[in-house]
């Protein structure tokens, strides 16, 4: 099973720097392993895993072109994407926040505080759309991966990063100079659903994926993975 992903999106997917093969690990990879396990049981043969770790933009193109079997990349199932791919049930819901330098946090009490400021985001993501459409008067810097967006913030090239709260946690643990500010995003964009994408026309596979998601949710595995991989990511990021 070929999995498209974009490492650097902790705790969903990131490179394990302690592994000899620089394996991609995280919440999404753990969920992918469960899907492979269920698919192997159904087919009666061992299904192998191949991870195509590129960029989020390349991931989207690969799924739309039916070049991969599945995309696990902390992705939101927005209507625009549904034209080119099918989505699983939602397996995680998270709040969208703005991460800033702790020293500047007091000046950001609402989204209007970011007028004439620079916001860094990951390219072709929900967060990019939020920055472009819901933050008045900001300049948007789009990077291929979220660590590069965070680097813009820590090197004073950006004033904030629109980021999912789950993804922010490893950075906040590893760097006490960063915080989530008090400014709340508009209600219609504040919360993000996360789902799995597959090429169109794979209804049976999608059904198996949804069964796996429900089993993992019922067993509390997804929450467990978030805690586990946030901790690992923070340790590696700090190191």
Label the predicted regions.
Residues 1-72:
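Extracytoplasmic small-molecule ligand-binding "clamshell" domains
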Residues 2-5, 99, 118-120, 161, ...:
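Short, well-ordered beta-strand segments
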Residues 7, 92-102, 127-131, 165, 169-229, ...:
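Periplasmic-binding protein-like
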Residues 9-10, 22-39, 76, 97-146, ...:
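Bilobed "Venus flytrap"/periplasmic-binding protein-like clamshell domains
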Residues 13-18, 82, 111-113, 191-194:
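Short acidic, glycine/proline-rich loop/turn micro-motifs
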Residues 44-113, 186-187:
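Acidic, polar ligand-binding/catalytic clefts
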Residues 57-58, 72-84, 130-133, 154-155, ...:
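A ligand-binding cleft/hinge motif common to bilobed small-molecule-binding domains
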């Amino acid at each position: 099973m070929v999995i498209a992903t974009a490492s650097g999106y902790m705790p969903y997917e990131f490179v394990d720097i302690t592994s000899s093969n620089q394996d991609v690990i995280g919440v999404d990879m753990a969920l992918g392993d469960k899907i492979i396990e269920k698919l192997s049981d159904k087919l009666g043969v061992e299904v192998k895993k191949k991870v195509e770790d590129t960029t989020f933009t390349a991931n989207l193109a690969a799924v739309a072109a039916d070049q991969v079997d599945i995309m696990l990349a902390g992705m939101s199932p927005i209507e625009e994407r549904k034209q080119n791919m099918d989505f699983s049930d939602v397996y995680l819901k998270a709040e969208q926040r703005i991460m800033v330098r702790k020293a500047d946090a007091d000046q950001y009490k609402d989204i209007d505080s970011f007028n004439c400021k620079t916001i860094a985001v990951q390219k072709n993501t929900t967060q990019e759309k939020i920055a472009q459409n819901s933050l008045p008067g900001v300049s948007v810097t789009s990077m291929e991966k979220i660590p590069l967006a965070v680097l813009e913030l820590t090197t004073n090239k950006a004033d904030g990063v629109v980021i999912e709260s789950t993804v922010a946690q490893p950075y906040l643990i590893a760097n006490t100079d960063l915080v989530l500010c008090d400014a709340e995003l508009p209600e219609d964009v504040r919360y993000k659903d996360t789902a799995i994408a597959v090429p169109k026309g794979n209804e049976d596979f999608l059904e198996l994926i949804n069964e796996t998601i429900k089993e993992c949710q019922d067993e509390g595995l997804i929450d467990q993975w978030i805690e586990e991989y946030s901790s690992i990511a923070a340790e590696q990021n700090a190191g």
